[in-house]
C-alpha cells in the first residue's frame, strides 16, 4: 500500500453550521452520484477522484455547497459518509474518520471495517499506518502554520485509499486541505506532493519533505543513532553560549581546530511556528524524547517520524 501526496487546496476559514435542509439534500444527491460514479468507473476510481483537490471541490459545489470556504471539506465528507452508510459493501467503498474528535476514531473505524471485511491483520494495519503517517507528515514535516482538525479516510476492498484532511490558521483566517492517494511507490518523507493549489502563500514554512532537506533528514537520523551523551554534550555547548539576543557564535573544536558556527535567533514575528519560541537548549521535553530516540535508534527518517512521541517540536528541534 504505497502513497503519494495528491494535492493541497487553501481557502477561507468560515464559521457557523450547515443548514439541516441543505445537508439532507447533499446526502440524498451524494448517494445517487456515488452510485452512478461507482457503477460507471468502479470504487477505485471514485477513491482516486476524491484525492484530486479540484475534483473534490467541484463535487462539493455540484452537491449545492457552493461556498468556497473551509466548510465544504467537512460538510462534503460528512455527507458522503452518511450517503454510503449501510451500502458500503454493495458500493465497495468504506469511509472512516471525520472532524474533531471523530478524526481520532479513524484507526478504530478502519480496524472495525478490516474485521468485518476479513482483510487480515497485515492489510488492516497497513491502512491504519498510512492514515496515521499522512497526518504526521502534514503536521510535523510540513510546518506551514495550519493545525489539523479534520481527517477522513476512504478505501476500497482492492486496497486503493485516499485521505482528505484539513488544517486551520486562525491568524491568517484560512484553512488548508491536504489530499493523499495510494498509487505508485513513493517516499513518504521526500517530496510526496504531486500538486499544490493555494490562494495563500507563506514564506515562513519548515518544509522537511523537500528534496533540498535531504541533508537535514540524513543528519537527523545520524543524531538519532548517536549516543545520548554525545547529543547532550552538544546541548551543553548551546546552554553555555546562548543568550536572548540574535547573534552568530563561532566555536572551535579543541582537538581538530574545526570551527562550528551557530545561529541564535530571538523570538520575533514568527507566529506561524510557535514551536520556535521554545528554547530547545533548556527543554526537559527535548532531553526526554532524545533519550528515547537514541535508545531505539530508528533506521530511517520515516521510522523516526513514526515513533510515538515524536511530533512537530522534536522534528523541528533536530532540524535546528
Task: Map each language-model feature to its residues.
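Structure-specific DNA junction-binding interface
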Residues: 1-273
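Alpha-helix initiation and N-capping motif
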Residues: 52-56, 283-286, 298
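Short, glycine/acidic-rich beta->alpha junctions
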Residues: 145, 296-297
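Helix-hairpin-helix
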Residues: 276-285, 293, 300-320
Amino acid at each position: 500500500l504505497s502513497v503519494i501526496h495528491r494535492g493541497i487546496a487553501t481557502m477561507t476559514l468560515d464559521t457557523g453550521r450547515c443548514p439541516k435542509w441543505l445537508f439532507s439534500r447533499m446526502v440524498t444527491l451524494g448517494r445517487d452520484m456515488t452510485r452512478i460514479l461507482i457503477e460507471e468507473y468502479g470504487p477505485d476510481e471514485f477513491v482516486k477522484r476524491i484525492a484530486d483537490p479540484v475534483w473534490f471541490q467541484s463535487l462539493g459545489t455540484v452537491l449545492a455547497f457552493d461556498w468556497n470556504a473551509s466548510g465544504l471539506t467537512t460538510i462534503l465528507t460528512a455527507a458522503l459518509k452518511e450517503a454510503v452508510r449501510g451500502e458500503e459493501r454493495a458500493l465497495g467503498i468504506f469511509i472512516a474518520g471525520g472532524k474533531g474528535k471523530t478524526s481520532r476514531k479513524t484507526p478504530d473505524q478502519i480496524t472495525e471495517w478490516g474485521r468485518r471485511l476479513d482483510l487480515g491483520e497485515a492489510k488492516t494495519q497497513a491502512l491504519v499506518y498510512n492514515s496515521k503517517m499522512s497526518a504526521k507528515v502534514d503536521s510535523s514535516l510540513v510546518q506551514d502554520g495550519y493545525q489539523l482538525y479534520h481527517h477522513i479516510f476512504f478505501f476500497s476492498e482492492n486496497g486503493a485509499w485516499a485521505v482528505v484532511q484539513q488544517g486551520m490558521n486562525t491568524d491568517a483566517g484560512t484553512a488548508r486541505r491536504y489530499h493523499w492517494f495510494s498509487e505508485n511507490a513513493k517516499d513518504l518523507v521526500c517530496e510526496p506532493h504531486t500538486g499544490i493549489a493555494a490562494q495563500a502563500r507563506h514564506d515562513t514554512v519548515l518544509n522537511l519533505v523537500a528534496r533540498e532537506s535531504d541533508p537535514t533528514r540524513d543528519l537527523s537520523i545520524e543524531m538519532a543513532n548517536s549516543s545520548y551523551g554525545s547529543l547532550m554534550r552538544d546541548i551543553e555547548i548551546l546552554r553555555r553560549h546562548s543568550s536572548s539576543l540574535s547573534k552568530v557564535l563561532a566555536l572551535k573544536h579543541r582537538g581538530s581546530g574545526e570551527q562550528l558556527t551557530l545561529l541564535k535567533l530571538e523570538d520575533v514575528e514568527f507566529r506561524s511556528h510557535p514551536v520556535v519560541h521554545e528554547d530547545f537548549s533548556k527543554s526537559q521535553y527535548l532531553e526526554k524524547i532524545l533519550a528515547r530516540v537514541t535508545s531505539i535508534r530508528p533506521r530511517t527518517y520515516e521510522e523516526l517520524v513514526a515513533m510515538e512521541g515524536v511530533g512537530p517540536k522534536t522534528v523541528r528541534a533536530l532540524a535546528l
